[in-house]
Amino acid sequence: MSTICLNMIVKNEASIIVDTLTNILANIHIDYWVIADTGSDDGTQSVIQTFFQQRGIPGELLQHEWKNFGHNRELALQGAQGKTDYVFFFDADDRFEGTLALPEQLTATIYNFYLTNMVRTTRYPRRLLVKNDGSCEWVGVLHEVITAKNAATSNETYVEGDYHVISGRFGARNQNPNKYLDDAHMLEEAYAQEQNQALKRRYAYYCGQSYRDCNEPALAAEWYERNIELCSKTGEEVRFSLIALGSEYRKLNDSAKTLEAWWNAYNAAPQHAEALGLIAEYLYVLERYSLGLEVAKKATTLPDPLPHATLFVNEPVHRYVIWYELGRHAVKLSLCDDAYASAKHLLNQIEHSDALNNFILSILEALKGHIERDTFANGKQIQHRIAAMQQLQTDDTRTKHQGMLNWFMQTFVSAPPQ
């Protein structure tokens, strides 16, 4: 069985670090630990040492002066080198959720784990487990990444399973009210000094993200544009950057540039439906229903993206938004078949909200004739899904819900005669 060293950098995480380490040990067998503290004054160091002493797990606490994320993660990695077969990275405010099952014998150079945000809407891979033989290194001052020193001789894979790591925002760094502005300034400086084009592109993108997060859409758009200039014309990086760019132009009320960015995002990766979902939603706001319907219909024909082949998967867009937009545009255009298809699809998804349930019920209430003309089995399935609805917070939704159940009781009393 491959041995694993836990490798972290921490500062002032005394209030959460026990929960963090407990969560890790519940999911990963840790044989050794090397954690670097970068200047805690809240007793984080002693909390960590006591935690591992009580569990009989050997390890080392290092003290490093803070410079930047890539530099300090690399120092911590060097401190762990050779202590085990593999090294596992984790942030103090991240948490495993679900059931993780690592292979007993690890062989790849790099293992990606699947992460999600705190509201569980976006899924993406991150490299968290690598060979502990000096074959990998950290790069980047912020939003750093672990990379193989020799890509030709390394291999990378993904840890599949019914789990994810929730990327938290409750650690000490996130208590800084100027975090995103500080990050943007650091990334601007790094961009100006960096000669490596891949890192320069990465800094530009995350600088845009930081300005987005401190509500500076004009500056965010400027940095996304710089990032896009350095990207290839097709693929995931430019697709996601163009989606982000369009969102900032929308905040600036520039509809032409918003749609241009999102159309370019779709053209950069035409197998991906996310940009089309955003376009369809915006066309509804602009009251361009015919075009919006065609865009939404196209989006519904595209496959769900594979998490390991996509930078970030916006799951609600694929599960709900494109079908919701199909339904909204169809209602405006009085296209009953499309509206009915939308409602049936949405009804078969995990419940999202009272508002979406209200929308589904409104369509089905108006299209009872479609239900009657559908197969008996489909009609009963619709009845069962409506009966199972839980998110019924408003009086209007509850009234529609009860009305549909009463109608079903009168209409679908028993199976049709054979």
Show which residues each predicted segment covers.
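"A position-specific structural signal for the A-helix of alpha-solenoid helical repeats
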Residues: 206, 244, 278-281, 285, ...
